[in-house]
């Protein structure tokens, strides 16, 4: 887990790399291990998928468990795993939404959909809940993996708000009371700067 780009925090341009997802996954795993994301130890993946991801990208971490990170990190990870399990239906809806918009040519998109869906359940901006360095990095990651969904965010809505709005519109319901985003008194909550 030691590429120069990831150490510089430069995964925004990773899409040019032959293995773009590797750099993003490296950042996500490192952030989770350092307690800088909302993700549980398995990143929202089932044990088999997680083991495959680690074996494929980070074999040096193959024997690591959440318990090996220390008692506090282990406890936090277990709590995050429990919270994810309580919201499994919501996670699945988000995962399906992402997969419906996937590029379709990379099996790693399955992993990324599960990870992004798990991070959507966190309480901060999505890029922070994933442990990424910026909203722009998240945008590039989403455009790379889920372009058919990400390109619909033409008004630059915050990603979590955008995903949940897409789910509401799919089901024929609307969370918002305003007839349009432009007339909404909470416009800044959905479209304001993420700092």
From Swiss-Prot:
The gene is nifQ. GO terms for biological process: nitrogen fixation. Keywords: Molybdenum, Nitrogen fixation. Probably involved in molybdenum processing. Belongs to the NifQ family. This is Protein NifQ. It holds the Pfam family NifQ. The keyword Lyase does not apply. It comes from the Bacteria. The keyword ATP-binding does not apply. GO terms for molecular function: molybdenum ion binding.
């Amino acid at each position: 887990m030691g590429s120069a780009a990831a150490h510089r925090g430069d995964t925004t341009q990773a899409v040019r790399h032959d293995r773009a997802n590797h750099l993003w996954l490296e950042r996500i795993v490192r952030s989770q291990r350092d307690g800088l994301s909302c993700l549980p130890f398995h990143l929202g993946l089932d044990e088999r998928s997680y083991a495959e991801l680690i074996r494929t990208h980070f074999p040096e971490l193959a024997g690591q468990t959440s318990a090996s990170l220390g008692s506090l990190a282990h406890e936090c990870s277990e709590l995050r795993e429990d919270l994810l399990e309580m919201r499994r239906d919501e996670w699945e809806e988000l995962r399906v939404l992402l997969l419906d918009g996937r590029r379709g040519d990379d099996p790693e998109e399955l992993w990324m959909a599960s990870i992004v869906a798990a991070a959507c359940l966190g309480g901060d901006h999505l890029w922070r809940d994933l442990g990424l360095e910026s909203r722009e990095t998240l945008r590039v990651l989403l455009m790379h993996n889920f372009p058919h969904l990400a390109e619909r965010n033409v008004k630059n809505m915050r990603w979590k708000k955008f995903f949940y709005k897409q789910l509401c519109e799919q089901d024929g319901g609307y969370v918002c009371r305003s007839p349009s985003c432009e007339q909404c008194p909470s416009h800044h909550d959905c479209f304001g700067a993420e700092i």
